[in-house]
Amino acid sequence: MGSLGSDNIAELEANGSAFNLNPLDPEEFRRQGHMVIDFLADYYQNVHKYPVRSQVEPGYLKKILPESAPNQPESLETILDDITNHIVPGITHWMSPNYFAYFPASGSTAGFLGEMLSTGFNAVCFNWMSSPAATELETIVTDWLGKLLALPEKFLFSGGGGGVLQGTTCEAILCTMTAARDKVLNKIGKDQIGKLVVYGSDQTHCALQKAAQIAGIHPANFRAVRTFKSDAFGLNPEELRKVVSADVEAGLVPLYLCPTVGTTSSTAVDQLRGLCSVAEEHEMWVHVDAAYAGSACICPEFRHFIDGVEGATSFSFNAHKWFFTNLDCCCLWVREPQALINALSTNPEYLRNKATESQKVVDYKDWQIALSRRFRAMKLWMVMRSYGVANLRNFLRSHVKMAKLFEGLVSADERFEIVVPRNFAMVCFRFNPTKKDRATGPELDRINEFNRRLLEEVNSTGRLYMTHAVIGGEYVMRFATGATLTEEKHVRCAWRAIQEHAAALMEKIYYKQRN
């Protein structure tokens, strides 16, 4: 490896470039760390001024940045300038108080600082021996959170189950489906994999279908059971029973059911207790996906949404969605940890150690797809300690209150309608001045197209950002409160902007028709 001569160093210093032979010099770390914290504090203070959805065109960054990496070091000051001028314009600002799209990414000071500590320790926490504190803290915080959710004891370490922090719900579903697959194939033979069937609804997140593909489930054996408006688009147990019965009669093997508490499109809630009963008849693995709404269930008034979870095999929710824990942090609990371990464990010689052989420790590498893993428990622990249960509940309630406010504003305008019941902090609505409940054919197409155009015009301004869904054939706008910085004033401003653009679009269409 070559070295820089004194002339080169002098030239670098003269040009103001940062240079240090130690890439982790404590004093330089302190200096630059303060600069980055100040940069982010200013960003949070001013994020409301930025267009929420990035206004750049595809390929914009390639036109700005050099074609190759710099040969010599550049100062952090220079890099931060480039971030301000080139990167920030290309960010869709999920932390903006005017962000109402998808579901929120509700970061917090505690979540950020926990992530900072985790990154600073840079521990690779694949088994207990590789970082005992990381493993043991994870077992503790998942039990803490399981108790907050009033999960049955059998999901906690204290009751023979246990929790693990995955990256996302996609990983949680894939891990549990793999465990379910191997458990069944060990009974009926591995050559029978083509008979295994996976069940969700037509509202279930696409992660289920992706997991089924990866797990080797035949594409023809994936069932998206139809939902109906009469059930608020939640999965009905009797509809599931019909589909499962037909599969059994055809000689197929029901494997895995994924009910959802808070679907992505409309926050619909599947009927857990009845669905678990159907699954039990066929010895299916039931994984409850509460990625978004699980956070709300720490509040007693929302806990009923997961009634029936005692009949499930596993349960997960994303703390990085609505629990003030910075991305990524999916909390997964299983009743049978050994099923995960049997499907996912590897024990090469170089990982063998006395702690593992004692069988007194948890090795989380055997609860996930990858070997290496991050110290995710640190940020979740800090969030729960820094805010406390009472404040966490009140934060969640404040977001629900803002959603109720928006729901009331929509209902008061006769041109708009609420499309499905609001369960949590997301409102599905659309422009429909005729208020015909079941418009069909060309009329439905016109209403859908108007709402599509309205959403795009609102989003293109950068004043706020929403996303859409198609529910029962109806194109709807989704307004999800929950961004950490959002206040009631932002909700009211967003509604005024929507009304203004609806009126302008109506005028534009009317003018075009007249001429």
UniProtKB/Swiss-Prot annotation:
The keyword Transport does not apply. Pathway: Alkaloid biosynthesis. Its cofactor is pyridoxal 5'-phosphate. One of its GO terms (biological process) is alkaloid metabolic process. GO terms for molecular function: pyridoxal phosphate binding; tyrosine decarboxylase activity. Catalyzes the decarboxylation of L-tyrosine to tyramine, which is converted to norbelladine, a precursor to all Amaryllidaceae alkaloids such as galanthamine, lycorine and haemanthamine, and including haemanthamine- and crinamine-type alkaloids, promising anticancer agents. Substrate binds at residues 105, 205. Keywords: Alkaloid metabolism, Decarboxylase, Lyase, Pyridoxal phosphate, Repeat. Its EC number is 4.1.1.25. One of its GO terms (cellular component) is cytoplasm. Sequence repeats lie at residues 81-138, 141-192. This is Tyrosine decarboxylase 1. Pyridoxal 5'-phosphate binds at residues 169-170, 264, 318. It catalyses: L-tyrosine + H(+) = tyramine + CO2. Residues 81-192 are annotated as: 2 X approximate tandem repeats. Gene3D superfamilies: Aspartate Aminotransferase, domain 1 (3.90.1150.10), dopa decarboxylase, N-terminal domain (1.20.1340.10), Type I PLP-dependent aspartate aminotransferase-like (Major domain) (3.40.640.10). InterPro entries: Aromatic_deC (IPR010977), PyrdxlP-dep_de-COase (IPR002129), PyrdxlP-dep_Trfase (IPR015424), PyrdxlP-dep_Trfase_major (IPR015421), PyrdxlP-dep_Trfase_small (IPR015422), Pyridoxal-P_BS (IPR021115). The modification N6-(pyridoxal phosphate)lysine is found at residue 321.
